[in-house]
Amino acid sequence: MDISKVDSTRALVNHWRIFRIMGIHPPGKRTFWGRHYTAYSMVWNVTFHICIWVSFSVNLLQSNSLETFCESLCVTMPHTLYMLKLINVRRMRGQMISSHWLLRLLDKRLGCDDERQIIMAGIERAEFIFRTIFRGLACTVVLGIIYISASSEPTLMYPTWIPWNWRDSTSAYLATAMLHTTALMANATLVLNLSSYPGTYLILVSVHTKALALRVSKLGYGAPLPAVRMQAILVGYIHDHQIILRLFKSLERSLSMTCFLQFFSTACAQCTICYFLLFGNVGIMRFMNMLFLLVILTTETLLLCYTAELPCKEGESLLTAVYSCNWLSQSVNFRRLLLLMLARCQIPMILVSGVIVPISMKTFTVMIKGAYTMLTLLNEIRKTSLE
């Protein structure tokens, strides 16, 4: 990639292509697909999302033991969360697309190769995370297919209610297994996108903050400039910071409620899967299948917490850069402007979910402890039922 031509939105191209396939990002009305996109969206979402959700939910309601309830809940709750996330993306789509213009505006403000290299490194990191999640989900789907193939009796990848008799006939079983696996592959694509797009946006915000910190730290050094020129440069940097804050607040509005639900959903999934694996009577392939699901769900939340801390970390670097610039030799007006920027930089860029819960590694640790507490409670219920 040419270092002189940096486009931050390149990291988002695959995400929005997948969202278009998912039926929530319509193309132009002049195209054939655009004119029929509404019908396509309805067919796709009913077939691959609503039907599979109904199957999971009915199977959950038909649970007749704590073990089967836990096995069903650990797939029903995350899938419900993904559907809510998809609805949220559709609701906030216009605002998220408009943020691309702000990213391109920040790209134009890059002043040297070092800053461009920072942005390129962020794009490469986001693409690496996307590829890694894709490989993890692919391994999970492949393992599920192996589990189906190796099973001694007709079974599906995850516990599902099917409204017809699919166990007694080989042809009915094969058709059902193929349909079910295809639907889960479509949902795996959805999970890939919904798991990685928040991290991509957060990484882009963090690297642009880092590039701005580099620009600010160089203020006042090098060849002397007139006071008016220095003030104009600083005003430009303040505007850049305001754009970054707008991006961050836009992300917070887009992710807040779904992230709050994600913490709860992941904790429940961890608790129920661990209970099923520890106390359920399962074979090795079924054990591995559910274990991979546990790893995927936990990694998704871990990734969100990790990337949510990046803007906060780079915000602290920007604060340090404000102190590091050569402000002593500048005019009084310059110092006043710098104090305004300093005051705003002192407010940390902490992403908050559900108004009160910060998205951070500390919250992730609390979630793990909560899952362990619920697992202990389920174990006590199991012991009581056995007595």
Swiss-Prot record:
<keyword id="KW-0716">Sensory transduction</keyword>
<feature type="topological domain" description="Cytoplasmic">
    <location>
        <begin position="193"/>
        <end position="254"/>
    </location>
</feature>
<feature type="transmembrane region" description="Helical; Name=3">
    <location>
        <begin position="128"/>
        <end position="148"/>
    </location>
</feature>
<feature type="topological domain" description="Extracellular">
    <location>
        <begin position="149"/>
        <end position="171"/>
    </location>
</feature>
<feature type="topological domain" description="Cytoplasmic">
    <location>
        <begin position="307"/>
        <end position="336"/>
    </location>
</feature>
<comment type="function">
    <text>Odorant receptor which mediates acceptance or avoidance behavior, depending on its substrates. The odorant receptor repertoire encodes a large collection of odor stimuli that vary widely in identity, intensity, and duration. May form a complex with Orco to form odorant-sensing units, providing sensitive and prolonged odorant signaling and calcium permeability. Involved in the preference for citrus fruits for oviposition, especially through the response to valencene, the primary ligand of Or19a.</text>
</comment>
<feature type="topological domain" description="Cytoplasmic">
    <location>
        <begin position="93"/>
        <end position="127"/>
    </location>
</feature>
<comment type="similarity">
    <text>Belongs to the insect chemoreceptor superfamily. Heteromeric odorant receptor channel (TC 1.A.69) family. Or2a subfamily.</text>
</comment>
<comment type="subunit">
    <text>Interacts with Orco. Complexes exist early in the endomembrane system in olfactory sensory neurons (OSNs), coupling these complexes to the conserved ciliary trafficking pathway.</text>
</comment>
<feature type="transmembrane region" description="Helical; Name=1">
    <location>
        <begin position="41"/>
        <end position="61"/>
    </location>
</feature>
<dbReference type="InterPro" id="IPR004117">
    <property type="entry name" value="7tm6_olfct_rcpt"/>
</dbReference>
<dbReference type="GO" id="GO:0050911">
    <property type="term" value="P:detection of chemical stimulus involved in sensory perception of smell"/>
</dbReference>
<feature type="topological domain" description="Cytoplasmic">
    <location>
        <begin position="1"/>
        <end position="40"/>
    </location>
</feature>
<keyword id="KW-1133">Transmembrane helix</keyword>
<dbReference type="GO" id="GO:0032590">
    <property type="term" value="C:dendrite membrane"/>
</dbReference>
<dbReference type="GO" id="GO:0170020">
    <property type="term" value="F:ionotropic olfactory receptor activity"/>
</dbReference>
<feature type="topological domain" description="Extracellular">
    <location>
        <begin position="276"/>
        <end position="285"/>
    </location>
</feature>
<dbReference type="GO" id="GO:0005886">
    <property type="term" value="C:plasma membrane"/>
</dbReference>
<dbReference type="GO" id="GO:0005549">
    <property type="term" value="F:odorant binding"/>
</dbReference>
<keyword id="KW-0675">Receptor</keyword>
<dbReference type="Pfam" id="PF02949">
    <property type="entry name" value="7tm_6"/>
</dbReference>
<dbReference type="GO" id="GO:0007165">
    <property type="term" value="P:signal transduction"/>
</dbReference>
<feature type="transmembrane region" description="Helical; Name=6">
    <location>
        <begin position="286"/>
        <end position="306"/>
    </location>
</feature>
<keyword id="KW-0552">Olfaction</keyword>
<feature type="transmembrane region" description="Helical; Name=4">
    <location>
        <begin position="172"/>
        <end position="192"/>
    </location>
</feature>
<feature type="transmembrane region" description="Helical; Name=5">
    <location>
        <begin position="255"/>
        <end position="275"/>
    </location>
</feature>
<dbReference type="GO" id="GO:0004984">
    <property type="term" value="F:olfactory receptor activity"/>
</dbReference>
<keyword id="KW-0807">Transducer</keyword>
<feature type="transmembrane region" description="Helical; Name=2">
    <location>
        <begin position="72"/>
        <end position="92"/>
    </location>
</feature>
<protein>
    <recommendedName>
        <fullName>Odorant receptor 19a</fullName>
    </recommendedName>
</protein>
<feature type="transmembrane region" description="Helical; Name=7">
    <location>
        <begin position="337"/>
        <end position="357"/>
    </location>
</feature>
<keyword id="KW-0812">Transmembrane</keyword>
<keyword id="KW-0472">Membrane</keyword>
<feature type="topological domain" description="Extracellular">
    <location>
        <begin position="358"/>
        <end position="387"/>
    </location>
</feature>
<keyword id="KW-1003">Cell membrane</keyword>
<feature type="topological domain" description="Extracellular">
    <location>
        <begin position="62"/>
        <end position="71"/>
    </location>
</feature>
